[in-house]
Amino acid sequence: MSNIAFYVVSDVHGYIFLTDFTSRNQYQPMGLLLANHVIEQDRRQYDQSFKIDNGDFLQGSPFCNYLIAHSGSSQPLVDFYNRMAFDFGTLGNHEFNYGLPYLKDTLRRLNYPVLCANIYENDSTLTDNGVQYFQVGDQTVGVIGLTTQFIPH
């Protein structure tokens, strides 16, 4: 039997660094870069590990607000996420705050699959797939991406 670990990053809300850039000498206890560093240090001890973004990454920080207000593109944020080498992600309710066109553009730019089995647009799922299967040794691992019921179908 393989030794498997799941690392889940959730509710980052665009906090990449240990600051929100709103004042000097103000620090957050965690950000995406620090979380990724901790994960990468720990995952070495496992035969197989999966790094997952559990959603709510696209909205919430001054950085995200700046991107939507001044460039209309999430590309700088996506660049950070793509470098983190996530195996897959899911959608949180805040991914929809800037509108569906912005979200769809962001999803096209990500270099990992985003799983969401329960959000629909015009009778089809919003993402390409809601389920992903992985073969780990002699085991098949299935992962389902689901989003809170507060998002309309």
Question: What would you call each of these model-derived segments?
Answer:
Residues M1-H153:
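Acidic, metal/ion-coordinating pockets
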